Amino acid sequence: MAASGAVEPGPPGAAVAPSPALAPPPAPDHLFRPISAEDEEQQPTEIESLCMNCYCNGMTRLLLTKIPFFREIIVSSFSCEHCGWNNTEIQSAGRVQDQGVRYTLTVRAPEDMNREVVKTDSATTRIPELDFEIPAFSQKGALTTVEGLITRAISGLEQDQPARRANKDATAERIDEFIVKLKELKQVASPFTLIIDDPSGNSFVENPHAPQKDDSLVITHYNRTQHQKEMLGLQEEAPAEKPEEEDLRNEVLQFNTNCPECNAPAQTNMKLVQIPHFKEVIIMATNCENCGHRTNEVKSGGAVEPLGTRITLHITDPSDMTRDLLKSETCSVEIPELEFELGMAVLGGKFTTLEGLLKDIRELVTKNPFTLGDSSNPCQKERLQEFSQKMDQIIEGNMKAHFIMDDPAGNSYLQNVYAPEDDPEMKVERYKRTFDQNEELGLNDMKTEGYEAGLASQR
């Protein structure tokens, strides 16, 4: 991954040599400009480099660009005028997400083979029914379909088959049998499971039923293990020692980060805030001076509650849009009248108003990259247009609806405008979590009482 403002090393076969004669061009407004043949300002950076073939000086050209609906990349090209050696390579420059992501797709019909898939270099692809796995970093990233992934795997297995058959290798026959099984998957004679596990969080599998829930697709966000962090080249910074007298509640802390829109350096502000009639939370806000993008995120400042919380609000008046709202990362949102459900971890944690969250949901659904452009499905466009119109009616107060927040961790909040009295239009339920919910929160294997005895026995 390329850091903002840095230049990636040259491709294999080239070593950069110092050259005072070449000065870097002035930095553009955006580090990664959308790729376009008509953009005259989008010029590659040229660096004189050492050719590892003839050891004379050649030229490396670097182009920082962005592929629409995909991610940022660095295109590098080396050529040597002395020996004719040349090399071209594409490297990812996308930002590693806060969490890894795992897509589990059950392919039941031929239509599922046409789902759009974004697979990055760090993603692992598995088909459990065939005990088949494509390890991470064994293939370059690709924008393809489910069928394209299988076709690419078949091509890779067939590549060295002629040499194996010529040498009468015993594995050639077994590979042929396995290739036949992969080709049968493309016919979808029976259901099978496709798993794409990406620790970087940058892979994607299309939901053709958006904004409705996809019963065939399960999306799981998870925290990376130490091994996965090392594989991605991420290093945890040692926490800085803070003075004992430091009071974080009355101070706004700042730390450096990269803008999620233009990838330019930006600053994030963080502060502890006490929400009335609720608890303490951490609010983080980022403001990019380069492109003007603004974002905010909320983290819970307390522990997981003993019981989960389900809040149901009957929206009957436009004034309901002004209610303060805290949505944690573990909270899901449901609007039954629209047959809409927003899963956990989507949109992250937010401290906003009800109107602000509904607008964020509308923008998230309507700006899905696979529903835009000439190749999108007209029926899907109509569904999204109808969904957007109904959402506008709810925001404007012209349509009554139920707004449900379900947080197994109990760290979400919706303002009661009648506090401390009960709100006649709002229902707050406390419930006991299921085993699966505790498993997803990592609570089943957590021992908080009597652990001293276990440690003593291990010694």
From Swiss-Prot:
InterPro entries: Znf_ZPR1, ZPR1, ZPR1_A/B_dom, ZPR1_jr_dom, ZPR1_Znf1/2. Coiled coil: none annotated. One of its GO terms (biological process) is protein folding. Pfam families: jr-ZPR1, Zn_ribbon_ZPR1. Residues 1-32, 439-459 are annotated as: Disordered. Keywords: Cell projection, Cytoplasm, Differentiation, Metal-binding, mRNA processing, mRNA splicing, Nucleus, Repeat, Zinc, Zinc-finger. A zinc finger (C4-type) spans 51-83, 259-291. It is found in: Nucleus; Cytoplasm; Nucleus, Nucleolus; Cytoplasm, Perinuclear region. GO terms for molecular function: protein folding chaperone; translation initiation factor binding; zinc ion binding. Residues 1-20 have a biased composition (Low complexity). GO terms for cellular component: axon; Cajal body; cytoplasm; Gemini of Cajal bodies; growth cone; neuronal cell body; nucleolus; nucleoplasm. Belongs to the ZPR1 family. Acts as a signaling molecule that communicates proliferative growth signals from the cytoplasm to the nucleus. Plays a role for the localization and accumulation of the survival motor neuron protein SMN1 in sub-nuclear bodies, including gems and Cajal bodies. Induces neuron differentiation and stimulates axonal growth and formation of growth cone in spinal cord motor neurons. Plays a role in the splicing of cellular pre-mRNAs. May be involved in H(2)O(2)-induced neuronal cell death. NCBIfam families: ZPR1_znf. Component of an import snRNP complex composed of KPNB1, SNUPN, SMN1 and ZNF259. Interacts (via C-terminal region) with SMN1 (via C-terminal region); the interaction occurs after treatment with serum. Interacts with elongation factor 1-alpha EEF1A1; the interaction occurs in a epidermal growth factor (EGF)-dependent manner. Interacts (via zinc fingers) with EGFR (via C-terminal cytoplasmic kinase domain); the interaction is negatively regulated in response to epidermal growth factor (EGF) stimulation and EGFR kinase activity. May also bind to the PDGFR receptor. This is Zinc finger protein ZPR1. It comes from Papio anubis.
